[in-house]
Amino acid sequence: MEALLVGEISLIPVVGFATITRFDLAERLMGSIDYPVDHLVIVNNSGTQTWQPEKPKLVNHLWHLEVPFGLGLVGAWNLIIKSTPYAPYWVLVNDDAWFASGALETIEREVDTEALNFVHIEQTPWAAPIFGEGCVRRAGLYDEAFYPIYFDDNDYERRITNAGVEIKQLSARIHHEPMTTRQNFLQQNARTWVANENRYRRKIAEDDYSVHGWSLDVRRENRWD
C-alpha cells in the first residue's frame, strides 16, 4: 500500500495506546509526537470519565474511546487495529513509553508493512510493536484469552513464527519507564500471571496455534476492577 501523504510529507497512519490511571504519562507520550500522524487512537480503560485529552498539533484525527470497564491491554490494541482497518501499519505503544526525537519519522521511513516491526526500547520490544498489515493478515490479532496482560506477547510471537511472518528491527528509539513496581499492580498481577502462564503452557502442550478469544468467565476471573 502506498504511504499516506500530506503535501510531500508521509504520515504515520495510526498511533494507538491504552491508558488506565496515569494520564500524566499518557500526556507525556502524546507530547512526544514530533511527526505527522493521521489517526491517534486512545482506548481509556479507566472507566472514570475524568480525562479529556487534547489533540496534538501534528495529529489529524484524535479518537478517545472510553469504556465502562477495562478491555485489558491487548483487547484495547485489537480494538485500535479493528477500528482503523485500512491502515498499512499500526504503531502501538504502552502509555508509560514515549517517542525519542525523530523516532516516528524513522519508523515511517523503515517500516515493513508485511512484517512485525520492533524498535529499540528499554525492557521489552513488546512495549511498542509495529504491526504491518501483512502480519495481521497472516497471523491475526492478539488472543484476548490472555486477560488483562502478560503471556499475550509470548503467544503472539509463537503464532507469527508459525505463520512465517518476518520480524524486522528498526533503528528508531522509544523510551520506556515501566510502572510494574507499583504495589497494587504486583498484587493483582500475582494472581492473573499464573492463570495466563498456565493457559499459554497448555497451548504449547497441545500444539495449539488458534485464537481462543475473549471469554466472559476469564474476564470475570481475572478482573482487576
Model-flagged regions — what are they?
Residues 34-66:
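Acidic donor-binding segment of Leloir-type glycosyltransferases
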Residues 154-225:
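C-terminal catalytic/acceptor-binding lobe
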Residues 102-120:
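Conserved donor-nucleotide/metal-binding helix-loop-beta segment in metal-dependent transferases, i.e.
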Residues 133-150, 159-170:
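Aromatic-glycine-rich donor-binding/catalytic loop that engages nucleotide-sugar donors
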Residues 87-98:
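Short beta-strand-to-loop acidic/aromatic patch adjacent to the donor-nucleotide binding site
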Residues 67-84:
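Glycine-rich, basic loop-to-helix element that forms the pyrophosphate-binding segment
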Residues 21-35:
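Short, well-formed alpha-helical segments that are part of the catalytic scaffolds
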Residues 117-129:
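Short beta-strand-to-loop element that shapes/binds the nucleotide-sugar donor at the catalytic cleft/hinge
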